[in-house]
């Protein structure tokens, strides 16, 4: 029989060997209680969802108004013609590491945007959606 402390030590060692980087699958809803309010405000407002070329675009508005499954998202009615999955989007969530989840009415994440570099990238790329960005002023 293997002592519990050996099993715990092996589990810890394996966890350390597997890397400490947080993957997109590990993201959790962000605890915004300690976040600078101005940083949070910068997340709210108009955004553009686009394909990789930027030729296909869809306008959304992310709000701070709570709803079932996250916060209210206003999706331009024309979006579902450009990106059919947008017809199912009912909420958005701010995730750790400033990720953005778009969720359906059953609270299932349909698209997750993360920032591996300096721009948001969709995971998975659905209906050609590649990124979400704030419109240039």
Which residues does each predicted region cover?
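Bacterial N-terminal signal peptides that target proteins for export
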Residues: 1-10
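C-terminal partner/receptor-binding element of secreted or periplasmic proteins
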Residues: 116-137
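Bacterial N-terminal signal peptides
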Residues: 9-18
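General beta-strand recognition
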Residues: 48, 59, 99-101, 121
């Amino acid at each position: 029989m293997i002592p519990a402390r050996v099993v715990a030590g092996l589990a810890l060692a394996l966890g350390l060997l597997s890397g400490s980087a947080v993957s997109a699958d590990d993201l959790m809803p962000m605890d915004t209680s300690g976040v600078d309010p101005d940083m949070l405000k910068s997340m709210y407002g108009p955004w553009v969802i686009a394909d990789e070329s930027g030729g296909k675009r869809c306008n959304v508005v992310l709000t701070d108004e709570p709803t079932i499954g996250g916060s209210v998202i206003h999706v331009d009615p024309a979006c579902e013609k450009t990106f059919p999955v947008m017809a199912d989007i009912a909420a958005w969530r701010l995730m750790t590491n400033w990720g953005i989840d778009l969720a359906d009415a059953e609270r299932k994440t349909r698209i997750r945007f993360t920032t591996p570099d300096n721009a948001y990238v969709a995971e998975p790329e659905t209906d050609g959606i590649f990124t979400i960005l704030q419109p240039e002023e």
